[in-house]
Amino acid sequence: MTLSKAKAFWQLTRMNRPIGSLLLLWPTLWALFLAADGIPDWHVLIVFILGVVFMRSAGCVINDFADRKVDGHVKRTANRPLPSGLVSSKEALILFSVLVTCSFILVLTMNTLTIMLSSIGVLLAIAYPFMKRITYLPQFVLGLAFSWAIPMAYAAESNQVPPEAWLLFVINAVWTIAYDTQYAMVDRDDDLNIGIKSTAILFGRFDKLMIGLLQLTVLTLLIALGIQLSLPSLYNWGVLAAAGCFVYQQWLIKGREREACFEAFLNNNYVGGFIFVAISASVLI
């Protein structure tokens, strides 16, 4: 394998852009630390961290495979490995299969319930990129895909998926829809020209309002989670910090400029981090 080919594979898996892995990792850590009362099993923790990296990379590969014929017409994606010809469709599918296989080998070390749940996660990862041609709600499917590690984490730690896990699942799914709508705002003009659907297009001139309502829902459900689990007041400071991030994001997207919308999307890494610190500190007290 040449250096240029290796670099193309690296770019195809987005290893050079870890924001997606972080946005997938944070809710996974929320779930692991809550399910384990602050001290997850080290083996489970390692498996899920590696699983996040492998499956996020696999999701990027299958996404670019699905978009290979349209990415060349979008300014932001025209130079990606598949539309530029640096990686063939066959090579992309082989890489996707390798990444999914690695993830499956990892999950085989977990209990039966976790293994069963993992199959749904793979289907969601495959389905998402193709939803952009079918529905204006592909972000809803992404929300499910990016949240599926939550019930898996609970299953791995406790061999059950309690109601709190599904509340956390909904919180993360709604948050994902909000931040991926910001991401979709970056490409909205290009997507309209090539027929790609998104919530950014669906919401239209109400995009900022809808993102705000989604963010308000996230904060409300986070407070409800804290009440349900009797988390200390320290937890609320994390929720308040997340609220501050959401206010900042609303300021960024006010003019709907591409760079500002992308910066708002990136800012969600801090939201995930603040909530993780709040959860982990609260359950360890």
UniProtKB/Swiss-Prot annotation:
Q: Where's it found, cell-wise?
A: Cell inner membrane
Give the catalysed reaction(s), semicolon-separated: all-trans-octaprenyl diphosphate + 4-hydroxybenzoate = 4-hydroxy-3-(all-trans-octaprenyl)benzoate + diphosphate
Q: Which residues cross the membrane?
A: 33-53, 93-113, 134-154, 166-186, 209-229, 233-253, 265-285
Q: Name one GO cellular component term.
A: plasma membrane
The GO terms describing molecular function are:
4-hydroxybenzoate polyprenyltransferase activity
User: Where does this protein chiefly localize?
Assistant: membrane
Kindly tell me the pathway this chain contributes to: Cofactor biosynthesis; ubiquinone biosynthesis
What is any one GO biological process for this UniProt entry?
ubiquinone biosynthetic process
The membrane-topology field of this record reads: Multi-pass membrane protein
Q: What domain of life is recorded for the organism?
A: Bacteria
Q: Which family does it belong to?
A: Belongs to the UbiA prenyltransferase family.
**Name assigned to this protein:** 4-hydroxybenzoate octaprenyltransferase
Q: Which organism is it from?
A: Aliivibrio salmonicida (strain LFI1238)
